[in-house]
Amino acid sequence: MLHIPSVLTSAQVIEIRQKLDAADWVDGKATVGAQGAQVKKNRQLPELSPVGMELGQIILKALVSNPLFFSAALPMRYMPPLFNRYEGGEHYGFHIDGSVRTIPGSNLSLRTDLSCTLFLCEPEDYDGGELIVSDTYGEHEVKLPAGDMILYPSSSLHKVEPVTRGARVCSFFWLQSMVADDGKRSLLFELDQNIQKLREKLGDCEEVVGLTGHYHNLLRQWAAV
């Protein structure tokens, strides 16, 4: 699980929120299967909403230029970003995201390796609404500033706590990584981050160049493109 700060600027968050606040929302149960519908109570923009598709492109363009996101996710294919809203006690109980999803408006599918939640409201704007992600190390509570994103394995059990004041507005989506295995992807991420730190201290010395070569050889061995 990784916190990626400042994916969007304050101006981008304001622009997106203005358009979302004027949009028509539908029952979130329309986008899940039978199991999810039993524990899901929120509202979403329809999957092929013109407003949602326009705003989703802003998010994806921002991510393309985010080196931390690319290093951690090694993205190959994205689901178009969706948008949800929780207020008045709305919540989403514990669930695991479906393993394969069809990209709306196409015949393409993707394997959901990583789940992304991008916050579009400040923590003080609402009470409750924490994203709880459960993994082998316990439960992690997530409530981030507007414009920040949390990235976590789609195999994780997770939920959204009831919102008791205000409104929690987020974008969420899934991606297929070039490296399907969480352990291998995490190893590559940690190696890349340490190489970047060494480069800042030592420049492109022989050892840093050698480690960079090892990184790319591992990626070449493990990546499916």
UniProtKB/Swiss-Prot annotation:
Please list the residues that bind Fe cation.
Answer: H95, D97, H158
Return the cofactor note field: Binds 1 Fe(2+) ion per subunit.
Q: Where is the Fe2OG dioxygenase domain?
A: 77-177
Instruction: Kindly list the biological process annotations in GO that this record carries.
Output: DNA damage response; intracellular iron ion homeostasis
Is Ribonucleoprotein set as a keyword in this record?
Answer: no
Q: Which Pfam families match?
A: 2OG-FeII_Oxy_3, PKHD_C
Q: What pairs make up the disulfide bonds?
A: none
Cite the EC number.
Answer: 1.14.11.-
UniProt superkingdom: Bacteria
Quick one: which residues bind 2-oxoglutarate?
R168
Among InterPro entries, the record links this protein to: Oxoglu/Fe-dep_dioxygenase_dom, PKHD_C, PKHD_hydroxylase, Pro_4_hyd_alph, Pro_4_hyd_alph_FE2OG_OXY
> Which molecular function terms from Gene Ontology are attached?
2-oxoglutarate-dependent dioxygenase activity; iron ion binding; L-ascorbic acid binding
Q: Which cofactor does it need?
A: Fe(2+); L-ascorbate
Keywords on record: Dioxygenase, Iron, Metal-binding, Oxidoreductase, Vitamin C
Its name, as the record gives it, is PKHD-type hydroxylase HEAR3399
